[in-house]
Amino acid sequence: DGVAPEGYHAMSIYPEYFKIDGAWLLAEDSRMDCVPVCEDGRIFVREFRHIRAGDAIVCGRTESGEQGIYVHTTGFDPAPDGEGELADAGRHADNFAFRLGRSRETAFSREYDELYELLKHEREHGYVVWVMGPAFSFNGFSRTAFSKIIEAGYVDAVFAGNALATHDLEGSYFHTALGQDIETQENRPLGHYNHLDTINRVRLYGSIGRFIEEEQVSGGIMHALEKKGVPYVLAGSIRDDGPLPCVLGNAYDAQDAMRSHLRKATTVVCMATMLHTIATGNMTPSYRVLADGTVRQVYFYCVDI
């Protein structure tokens, strides 16, 4: 168990087709760096830790169809313009370049406008996963803003760590984050105890939901998630305080919990967390197969600076 045969094929982020018994099968639920397993006439993509002796694992490392493996890298490229040319970003999608028509210093207001329109569509037709770092819990305005996004129905799941939840709850309970006022950033006397006292209190109640209910906590990100019934995955870290009782300390349990949502995700927005962004990116394919068989693009946004 847990060992692939020599010459196994490793998945990419792209749609991949496998010729099995004369028919081309699409891997419907993919994940990069995992292996394709043929089972009951379908292709399942599994992590190495989940493969078992006897699994029919696809072997082959060419990707243009000659070994019965086709990786479709251009399925979501921009449509040609009036002269038959692809948009600049599409032409250079496989090449690193400092400038793709616009520099990194260029304002991204156009992208935000597109994201607004996308989220309006996804609220009714998709599954939006947000991946968040603790920076959002250190500012009262950002906590309020994201709470409104949750309440408005633009959030289907949240991935974070112990820190985001801890300091957000600290903000609701003590009006501080790491002992600093969440509005003025002024240090509070003995404020360095506040996040520990918050963790301790939540552990007393056994869950974030019960802590919010019993302590009549209002406002903040975790309160909005609990009130709206939005699921969240809190993945543990080796540097966590506490942790909160719902934090998953086993990294692979956390991966599996995250992937259960990413199997449905159509848009992913990652903000202020390099670790969780990379982890989520590794588990997110560029496409999603809908119930009616439609293959659609998955949108992935990363805002880290």
Predicted regions: what they are:
Residues 219:
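Aromatic-rich carbohydrate-recognition surfaces in CAZymes
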Residues 240:
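Positions that flank functional sites
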